[in-house]
Amino acid sequence: MNRFLLPGGVFLLLVIVLFIGIQRAPQKTVIPSALLGKPAPQFTLPVLGSNESFSSASLAGRWHAINVWGTWCPECRVEHDMLLRIADSGALPLIGFNWKDQDEAALGWLDQLGNPYSVVVADRDGREAIDWG
């Protein structure tokens, strides 16, 4: 019986310390974005599947949503239906940043699942999307 008292006591002490630590921890931690209040980054990128380029200058004065996605990204597949619904509603134009992907794979993905974007740019090296946070 005595051989269980010490380990049991240590375990109980650890549970109490953990419980007190959880109770004293802040409930919500918000890390402010360094990009808030700053102008949107400028970019000029090739349009996916085209020889044309697209510049952020053409977006000036209007609201748009920028979505960074890739065919290799499981979360992108999950959110894709929601993006299609947003596009169908016409509430907000969507600009797609295809990030670090192969053009053929990205075009096939959009053909298969639908294209919610008014324009899709190919951010092949991934540098432009990083500027957007």
Question: What is the meaning of each model-derived region?
Answer:
Residues 1-46:
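N-terminal targeting signals for export/organelle localization
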Residues 43-65, 70:
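A short beta-strand-turn-helix
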Residues 3-4, 111-116, 123-133:
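Thiol/disulfide oxidoreductase modules built on the thioredoxin-like
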